[in-house]
Amino acid sequence: MAMKKLLIASLLLSSATVYGADGFVVKDIHFDGLQRVAVGAALLSMPVRVGDTVSDEDLSNTIRALFATGNFEDVQVLRDGNTLIVQVKERPTIASITFSGNKAVKEDMLKQNLEASGVRVGEALDRTTVSTIEKGLEDFYYSVGKYSASVKAVVTPLPRNRVDLKLVFTEGVSAKIQQINVVGNKAFSSDELISRFQLRDDVPWWNVVGDRKYQKQKLAGDLETLRSFYLDRGYARFNIDSTQVSLTPDKKGIYITVNITEGEQYKLSGVAVSGNLAGHSAEIEGLSKVKPGELYNGAKVTRTEDDIKKLLGRYGYAYPRVQTQTEIDDANKTVKLHINVDAGNRYYVRKVRFEGNDTSKDAVLRREMRQMEGAWLGSDLVEQGKDRLNRIGYFETVDTDTVRVPGSADQVDVVYKVKERNTGTLNFGVGYGTESGVSFQAGITQENWLGTGNTVGISGTKNDYQTYAEFSLTDPYFTVDGVSLGGRLFYNNFKADDADLSDYTNKSYGLDGTLGFPVNENNTLRVGLGYVHNSLSNMQPQVAMWRYLRSVGMNPSLSSNEDFSTDDFTFNYGWTYNTLDRGFFPTAGNRTNLNGKVTIPGSDNAFYKATLDTQQYVPLDQDHSWVLLGRGRVGYADGLSGKELPFYENFYAGGSSTVRGFRSNTIGPKAAYYNNGSSNCSGSDVAKICSSDDAVGGNAMAVASAELITPTPFLSEKYANSVRTSLFVDAGTVWDTHWDDTAATLGAGVPDYSKPGNIRMSAGLALQWMSPLGPLVFSYAQPFKKYDGDKAEQFQFNIGKTW
């Protein structure tokens, strides 16, 4: 024991050796061992100065002060007469930092953590800090189930008291959950409870959410899910007594045991609201989601608290406090809720500010605002502004923040933080298709031209059956009241016979203009005028086509092709109802469009045409990761004043935007030709009718789709807002209400195309990607209900189309 005490004393003396117990006056200070640290910097860190009278305690404080700088591994203070000699050993300087073997932890994250701990190139190496970092990283690996992981800091000495620091990772494998046990449950089976966990001991192949890899954070979330499950079903005394996580000897397997006490179900005996209600007591009391006599429900209590905060927020109370205390009567198995409300101060809005809009001008964002500066704060108005910014589609994300104004008790700034997305689409391509042959396409569309909010588009397509060019321009705020103005010029040379449609060629050009009038937050009315010139040629004698020509006063030959041209002026109208939460990749809300046109006097044709589209997004979970999408489209058109609808105005279905899995525009009525020499013909030589597989379209259409939008497997959260996957079922039909089912067409095997019941159906999966070149859509679908003459196309790819 005496030897041990002597050893401890000698160790203490080794760091500070001073001769003489009495104080003395310091006349000089010398340093021995300084290399990187300047003498002046070392002197400034010492509490002792030349001329001071110092004691042993002062010298001990000097040693502690020098150690505290982090620059020294060893410090000794010696006395030579009235001179202090400070002998130091500097910590080595870090020359470089490298990493090896790290896969689960990215280098950027490691560098940030090292920087935060003061470990960086050019600084002194603190071995204690490095040891702490080693342990912290190992603890992180343990928290994600990698119990065999290790992290070692390798320090390599270099000349001039420098070192290389290398962190060597051995990550190992993640421990798999072998079994999860819930002990103490009586009302619900263990399988039912565990099915609500993210962590699983058995994961079916189709479950993209469940995970057998242990993670401490996920377990904590699952325990909270378990707690909420019971509290939402009346078990007010539910408790998680303990949780055991056991590791197998090889550190590759984990057993989890959760011990619970369910308790009994409790009913509500009453709800009492008190506190500073800011004069809105009647409204607040009416918000309660819980009623006496029903089972206690924790989720309803939380929703009630949130609704009270939202209500007060609408009246300018930006920071209300709402707390609910439960008064539990164990004898009667009842719970009384005491909701205490403190509305706090009412706030004005000093400024509305925007952050992150590097391209979009402030005015483009500000015109979407409903919260005015200088007015009372209204949380609903702030939220409306957020919804409108999301809906215009210029931003990936929009977040809001209400910030108190320093020095003011009743003013706040409302800050909208946006992350802009690429709103321009530039594409140029050369391709080859079995239908189109060699294809050239080019286009540029900018939805937010120069940050003004205007949309400008120029596009063109050239292939075996079409030459198309278009220029369009839309100003969504032509007036300050939100009246929009849009216009379009186009040219189209279309050879229908080369596109699996009935035989004709149409060279058309035209223009149109549209004014849009906002009716309210969600409704817009559009009106406009249009003009189009159609020059039709090489029209092969065909039953539906010839029926139209006769209606406009022509007497076409049954044995030769015809040419025809028209000039039409139209009144265009439309209505849009939009409650979608975002302009692209929405997850909630509805968008319904009604579009139509009718010819006006001066036109060669007389007809009307209308289409109704609707999309409904229903989120299935709180995070909007799973969303049900229902889509529908119906269209109808007909002639006026005894004239028929022009055949080139018919509806078509099939393709990536209607019924996937079928070739574009091939669903519906097929052409029946006169005297085309086909083997499928019937009738006399003069009026012989021949069936075909060429699509001709119809004057009525109905399309529907049910789609389940799912989280994209194996995709980083970073890309969650730019990639979408879904499973779908599509259905659709096109028919001709004026089809004349004659004996001749029956003899040629031509079906009755006036029936709407010939519905085609398909099922498949789709992937959408908001790429730097614009939206890309891939789909694979398998038709499971089709008819003779239909043309399948399982894999389809489209650029620049989203829904």
From Swiss-Prot:
Keywords of this entry: Cell outer membrane, Membrane, Repeat, Signal, Transmembrane, Transmembrane beta strand
Boundaries of every POTRA domain copy: 24-91, 92-172, 175-263, 266-344, 347-421
Bilayer-crossing regions: none
Entries under Pfam families matching the protein: Omp85 (PF01103), POTRA (PF07244)
Endpoints of the signal sequence: 1-20
GO CC annotations, alphabetized: Bam protein complex
UniProt xrefs under PROSITE patterns: POTRA
GO biological process: Gram-negative-bacterium-type cell outer membrane assembly; protein insertion into membrane
Domain of life: Bacteria
Main location: membrane
Subcellular location: Cell outer membrane
Similarity remark: Belongs to the BamA family.
Purpose of the protein: Part of the outer membrane protein assembly complex, which is involved in assembly and insertion of beta-barrel proteins into the outer membrane. Constitutes, with BamD, the core component of the assembly machinery.
Binding partners and assembly: Part of the Bam complex, which is composed of the outer membrane protein BamA, and four lipoproteins BamB, BamC, BamD and BamE.
Entry-linked NCBIfam families: OM_YaeT, PRK11067.1
Name of this protein: Outer membrane protein assembly factor BamA
Organism of derivation: Erwinia tasmaniensis (strain DSM 17950 / CFBP 7177 / CIP 109463 / NCPPB 4357 / Et1/99)
